[in-house]
Regions:
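Conserved N-terminal beta1-alpha1 strand-loop-helix module at the mouth
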Residues: 1-91, 97-126, 151, 157-158, ...
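Active-site phosphate/pyrophosphate-handling residues
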Residues: 74, 147, 183
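A short acidic, helix-capping loop that chelates divalent metal ions and anchors anionic groups
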Residues: 76, 133-139
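Substrate-recognition "cap/lid" segment bordering the active-site pocket of phosphatases
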Residues: 138-150
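Short hydrophobic "strand-cap" motifs at the C-terminus of beta-strands
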Residues: 163, 185
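C-terminal binding/interaction regions
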Residues: 177, 181
Length: 206
């Protein structure tokens, strides 16, 4: 799948599944219309991350959706993911691009216009901006005002995805402002029916 065709971007968090099978949740979300899956793991060993990444990659490959690894270039390369997402405190984008060449997508986090312009200049393929509605999955995430998000969208030419507390009830507030799409964690994974949640998100966003 091409980045420009993706509207719903799933960022994983096994805890958000609330006891449901992690891999089944991902597969159901993809069936509902998720176009990108980012595997985000902060507190597991490299070996466990690698093994988890292989399983998620297989699911993504079966459904022809993009597979992104959060932060870890080594894991992304080892499992031949489609790309890597880098936050402001991760490896510099220009260094990642030097290592990965043009074979991998590089996503970047930007919370204001200055950061957005900078990451675009450094070679990012897309931007994730938030937390637009606050979030329970990231402890240090500051809320991003809607006006600032709109400015970010108009300041760059690369696709922008909003993230942070987005669910089926508030996603409609983000349509028609120029976003490529939206990223969601618990707004998909914590729902009883992940497939239906994504279908509703798509319907309410379009």
């Amino acid at each position: 799948m091409d980045l420009k065709d993706c509207k719903i971007y799933l960022v994983t968090d096994e805890k958000a599944c609330n006891g449901k099978d992690f891999y089944s949740c991902i597969e159901e979300a993809i069936k509902g219309g998720v176009g990108i899956v980012q595997l985000r793991e902060k507190n597991i060993s490299t070996k466990d991350f690698y093994e988890k990444a292989l399983k998620v990659k297989e699911i993504c490959k079966n459904y022809e959706v993009l597979f992104i690894i959060n932060d870890r270039l080594d894991i992304a390369q080892a499992v031949k993911a489609d790309g890597v997402h880098l936050g402001q405190s991760d490896m510099p984008i220009e260094k990642a691009r030097e290592i990965l060449k043009d074979k991998f997508l590089i996503g970047a986090t930007a919370r204001n216009v200055e950061e957005a312009k900078k990451v675009e200049l450094l070679g990012a393929d897309y931007i994730g901006s938030g937390a637009i509605f606050g979030t329970s999955t990231k402890d240090n995430a500051k809320k991003l005002e809607m006006e600032e998000l709109k400015k970010i969208v108009t300041s760059v030419k690369i696709p922008v995805f909003a993230i942070g507390g987005i669910n089926i009830n508030n996603v409609s507030l983000l349509k028609n402002i120029g976003l490529q799409g939206i990223c969601s964690v618990s707004g998909i994974l914590s729902e009883k029916d992940c497939k239906k949640a994504v279908e509703l998100m798509l319907k309410n966003f379009n």
